[in-house]
Amino acid sequence: MDDQFIKTSPDKEKAKSILKMAETTLEMIQTIDLERFPSNAAKEYYDVIRELISAVLLLDGYKTYGEGAHKKTIEYLSKNYKEFTEYEISAIEDLRTLRNRIAYDGFFVQKDYVTRKEKTLDSVIHKLRTMIKHKLQ
């Protein structure tokens, strides 16, 4: 394991709480006006996926920290969960990069980006939620 990962005891309660927060954020995304706020929708999608991946890590008994931790969580998912296609992993990584540009450079996303990626992002979110629920049983 990498030095950015800390081995911990699996934490089901924290994972449940993160799952609940992600589901609340997903509900909120449905209310975002994509014509006016596509960048906000993209950021929120990324936050949901990042949180769900961190819940998977928690259930596997890991935490990440430090510079590049988000990138490492995506790599962890790619290496350890083959149910995610290369295309899906690439979409998550693209979204991570885009979210950083939005947050740090004031970059604006076009509505078209969100509508083109929505199906893939929903698929990733569905897989992550299913995985977490299975691990919580």
Indicate residue ranges for each PLM-predicted region.
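Terminal alpha-helical segments
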Residues: 1-137
